[in-house]
Amino acid sequence: MNTGNSSIMRFFHLKLNIFLILSFLIFGFLFWHFAKEMLIVEKDGLYVGQVNLYGDLVLHLSFINKFLESGKILPDSPIFAQSKINYPIFADFTTAQIAKLTSVDFALFITTFLTGLLVIYVARIFILNFIKREKVVFLTLLIFFLNGGFGFIYFFQDYANSQKSITDFLFSMPNEYTDIKEKGYWWINSFLAYFLPQRGFLFAFPITLTILALLYTGFKKNKSYLIIIAGLLSGVLPLVHAHSLFLIFLVSLIYFPLSVMFSKEPERKNIIISWAIFAALTALLSIPIIKTISQDTNPLHFIRLDPGWTSKENIILFWGKNLGIFAPILTVALVWVYKNNKKLFSLYLPFAAIFIISNIFVFQPWEFDNSKLLIYWYFASSIIVAYFMYEFFFSEGLVHKTLGVVLIFFMVFASFLDIFRTFTPVTSYQIFSKEDIAIANSVKFLTNKNGTFVTAPIQNHPIPALSGRSTLVGYHGWLWTHGIDYTNRAQDVKKIYAGENFENLISKYRISYVTVGPHETNDFTINQKNLANYPRIILSQNWSLYDVSNIWANGNGQN
């Protein structure tokens, strides 16, 4: 009898953990798939397997190669020479250390894949703190990783207009269906918009969830050491992801008065002291780090009123189509959770507030970057929706289960299409040619690694991205989103190429090399007669450098 019961218990335990296996199998496989597409080395150049990597990965390559070539923990910015790096360095610094022993493409792969597994693991532990069901964990991850709205409608339109068979069309889809900005779809799949291109977020997400879990458990069980660990982790977040630190700040700012207000009198003093310890540790660590890596820019300068996030239409319509049926289900789920689990509802309130705040104010130059806060709101909301779906649909009879499957299908269908598309040839994008790689290698061999270059400010310029050298003014879009005022330098670069006030500007910025290649020829009017007065380094038929360091180095030029 006991043996029989033991066998039955083992069977149900195994059945329960199928969802644990599925969580790591499915989402771990997706992280592996995307990790191997981060940087693809082909005979004719370097490729990426996803369009959002086209711009973002080039920026990360600039930082990674700067760490590799400079040998410094805190080099100057590769895209704004002689200035602080002005960017969270942890992800790219870590990748660079692995690349020293292997290669950049492998380092990108292994850090993405292993950190992706950590994301799954930490997210699972976080969810189980509040809802101890593996099925809810799996549903949460499914909804979160495959977020999407009603963009799939355009899939059917595109298919109808394609005159192709369904198989041919699936393997040549012309568009993404969570990212259709011209039609107001901005809530992009979380893999494609966050975990892949935003490497800082990839590393910060599990750290942030750990901090929140430590705070929750620390206050719940009155464990001061957990609060201290949370404070230490929060304090180093500026090295990883600035918006995640801001998220912690907002959650704490909202939850602190709530925790004090609803605590009993004997506990109130300890709660206030614990929050003070957490805040003090965070500030003591984070403020010096921010001052060390960031330029002297006041972040409050960027905060502005901008209702509706990126919407150019009615905000309810905007979020309705971007979230799809997730929106009404979340509304119903919140009412249900309020009635059935008030504690969970109260824990959700700070994230609801963050959603509201992020739809009223913009906190950085580019409004889209509010999504770095909204993605945490969506994760919390996914837990609420998954919990409701499990209790209301998947714990009931066949009819309820079937309806639940249908609802989940429409929740994730747009993202499923976008992810499926990444397995097809249409999502291969070349970021650097074979010549670009050769140019970068020549620059490494022929120039001083500490020299400042003048280049065209394009996204995929091989010198700042691949050679580990710094350009006076890099891609304007990156500088703008980082809050850097580049306008004066940009004007000076034009003057340098035109030969205006040439020697004074070269001396002012201590420029070592002026680059003349296809990008510079396209972007500037170049005074070749002026440049002919300086030593020329021929990199290829189309590329040259002019060593101008003697102008300011008193004859001790850097070559």
For the regions a language model picked out, list residue spans one by one.
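Extracytoplasmic
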Residues: 393-559
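Membrane-interface helix-loop-helix junctions at transmembrane boundaries of multi-pass membrane enzymes
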Residues: 10-18, 217-226, 261-276, 332-352, ...
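Hydrophobic/aromatic-rich transmembrane helices and adjacent perimembrane loops
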Residues: 113-116, 201, 246-249, 366-392
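Hydrophobic, aromatic-rich transmembrane alpha-helices
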Residues: 210-218, 250-262, 323-345, 388-391
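Membrane-interface alpha helices of multi-pass inner-membrane proteins
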Residues: 192-195, 226-241
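Transmembrane-lumen/periplasm boundary regions of multi-pass, lipid-linked membrane glycan transferases
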Residues: 55-56, 60-63, 68-69, 257, ...
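Hydrophobic alpha-helical membrane-interfacial segments at the cytosolic entry of transmembrane helices
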Residues: 15, 19-26, 139-143, 232, ...
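Active-site lumenal/periplasmic loops and adjacent helix-entry segments of GT-C-fold
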Residues: 26-207, 242-243, 430, 457
